[in-house]
Amino acid sequence: MPDEIGSRRAGASGYNSRLLSSCGIPFMSNLASTQPNRGWAFWCKPLLFLIIAAIGLYYVKWSPYYLKAFVAADSHSIGASILNDQQSSPWSAALAYSQVYFLAIWKAAVLAVILGSLLQVLIPRDWLLRLFGRAGFGSTLRGGLFALPGMMCSCCAAPVAAGLRRQKVSVGAALAFWIANPVLNPATLVFMGFVLGWGFSALRLVAGIVLVLGVSLVAQRVAGPEQLPEAAVDAVVEASTVNEQSFLSRWGKTLWQLFWSTIPIYVLAVLVLGAARVWLFPHIDGAMGDSLWWLVPLAIAGTLFVIPTAAEIPIVQTMMTLGLGTGPAVALLMTLPSISLPSLLMLRKDFDARVLVTVAVLTMLVGIVCGLIGAALL
């Protein structure tokens, strides 16, 4: 094996040429001699991505959340529950919820599609593979850390996670990025501390780390061997190809592909769940308490349902006021933001179905376990 890797890195290996070609990656017979000159034209692309990401996140996330933190500290509330409109008809519930939901997230959704497409044309693939390309704990951890500035909900993080996967990033790293965005959102943890108490926030942080890393690593194992073997990853890391297409042409094509594969199914799924919330979230009364009979169904409903960023906080605050026990409340705090049926469907073309089912089931289980822990400790 070392001799084979050495001969590959020296160039001219017919086996690796066919291997990389089958994966859709050009092979260079002499990596050292074909390295392009990385001048200003090369470095300005990742710099442009960082500028666009920083401006977009400041406008959509960082500035509004900074101001909302003071509101949460002063009033111990960040607004009314998005489910608190007493709809009884599924059709009216679908329309009413979709309107409120999309008004809350449309800016973040637009930014996510832009960033997910720009990621594929402005960031060199070998950079991404160095950081996130290999399956393992280190790559998964870096994927989770990479998510922290984003502060997106699961559906808005999905297009960026899809963009990462299309650049051949490992399953574990892409999943960690996707799940960590809503679960480990620093702003949400601060809001939760001011509104529900710092015990809830601490439990969410610890359980969130376990959820992000544990679920991602298990799903990585379920996914099996990556499409790119280690030798192919090494070759791509060492090689950088020159694309003859213009930036606008490449970005336009990538943007359309990402939009078409994620947004239509997203809108449809939100409408369906908006109608289904009539049955997913029953009217709360004091008899529900910490009953296990409600803990499990609410964990399942929370895993499937879709909400904007931090909306789980007023939802749980309202439900607890009406009599919901601590256990089911903690289960909702863990499952509602983590993933959702729409976000799972948005990623159907970028992850194996077994991986997505594994993520959904493990998220439900984590929610149930956290509910039991929360009922005992909080």
Language-model features, listed with the residues they occupy:
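Short, low-complexity intrinsically disordered segments enriched in A/P/G/S/L with frequent Arg
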Residues: 2, 12-13, 17
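Intrinsically disordered, low-complexity non-transmembrane regions of multi-pass membrane transporters
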Residues: 23-51, 67-89, 224-254
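Juxtamembrane and boundary regions of transmembrane helices in multi-pass small-molecule transporters
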Residues: 44-68, 130, 134, 139, ...
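Structural signal for alpha-helical transmembrane segments and their membrane-water exit/capping regions
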Residues: 49-89, 111-124, 220, 240-242, ...
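Transmembrane helical segments that form the transport core of multi-pass membrane transport proteins
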Residues: 95, 112, 122-132, 248-326
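Alpha-helical transmembrane segments in multi-pass membrane proteins
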Residues: 108, 112, 116, 139, ...
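Alpha-helical transmembrane segments of multipass membrane proteins
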Residues: 116, 120, 211-219, 273, ...
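Membrane-interfacial helix-loop connectors
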Residues: 147-205, 281-355
